[in-house]
Amino acid sequence: MLIFDSGVGGLSILKNIKKILPNIHYIYMLDNESFPYGNKTEFFIIQRSIKIIHTIKKIYPINIVVIACNTISTVALSILREKFDIPIFGIFPHIKAAEKITKNKIIGLIATKATINSSYTQKTIYEYSCSNTIKIIGTNKLAVIAEKKIRGVAVSQKKLKNIFRPWINLPTCPDTIILGCTHFSLLEKEIKNILYKTRSVYFIDSIKKVIFQIKSYLKTSNVNQKIKKNIFLYSKNNNNLKKLLSFLKQYKFTVIKHINLN
């Protein structure tokens, strides 16, 4: 199984996969050279995704791919499924689930600008905005803050307030917030403190949905594990990566190495 993202947000998906499939072996591709995907063009996102899968598939016998990134999923998933002959799972902003949960009919969607601007997300927003008010924040800054938090950097309340200012000033805030990026679940507590100090809010991410899809597929398919180790690959060697190594210990990677994607 290959799981890839430009940052550590995808590790939240890996963590949940390990819970339901403790014996599965996996490759995590940290494309930190391209972090964040959210500020890249659709052309770059598509070509980079193809390059990642193609390069790793030549080296390792992967039989499932999990795109642990809303931006790539909304922009490139259909193209990747046409190009490769292995099952590819993606993660999407779960607006349908939010509609079922919201009480005040005001739904918040936080995602990268590329995810917000994708035709998939625009179509979904249009579909559900008839019966709900959907408040949108498109930001590439939140993923950077989440990455820094993982590496031990304190979360700046000032920066968070600047990002969420459009909602802070609303007379009625969304009671349900869709986390449209796998990084954002790392900041749930901080977001709640900024917006809802005395009120409750329901956060929705799509991790459970994609985990269910993967589990269902594995139950009905005869997939043989050909990878016998847990492997962590990265595309750029820098100081941030060194700070991440202690955090990675919990995932029991036996191989950590650089891979050239250029």
Curated annotation (Swiss-Prot):
Its EC number is 5.1.1.3. Pathway: Cell wall biogenesis; peptidoglycan biosynthesis. One of its GO terms (biological process) is peptidoglycan biosynthetic process. GO terms for molecular function: glutamate racemase activity. It catalyses: L-glutamate = D-glutamate. It is an enzyme of class 5 (isomerase). SUPFAM superfamilies: Aspartate/glutamate racemase (SSF53681). Keywords: Cell shape, Cell wall biogenesis/degradation, Isomerase, Peptidoglycan synthesis. Gene3D superfamilies: 3.40.50.1860. The keyword Isomerase applies. Substrate binds at residues 5-6, 37-38, 70-71, 182-183. InterPro entries: Asp/Glu/hydantoin_racemase, Asp/Glu_race, Asp/Glu_racemase_AS_2, Glu_race. The active site is at residues 69, 181. Belongs to the aspartate/glutamate racemases family. Provides the (R)-glutamate required for cell wall biosynthesis. This is Glutamate racemase. It comes from Buchnera aphidicola subsp. Acyrthosiphon pisum (strain 5A).
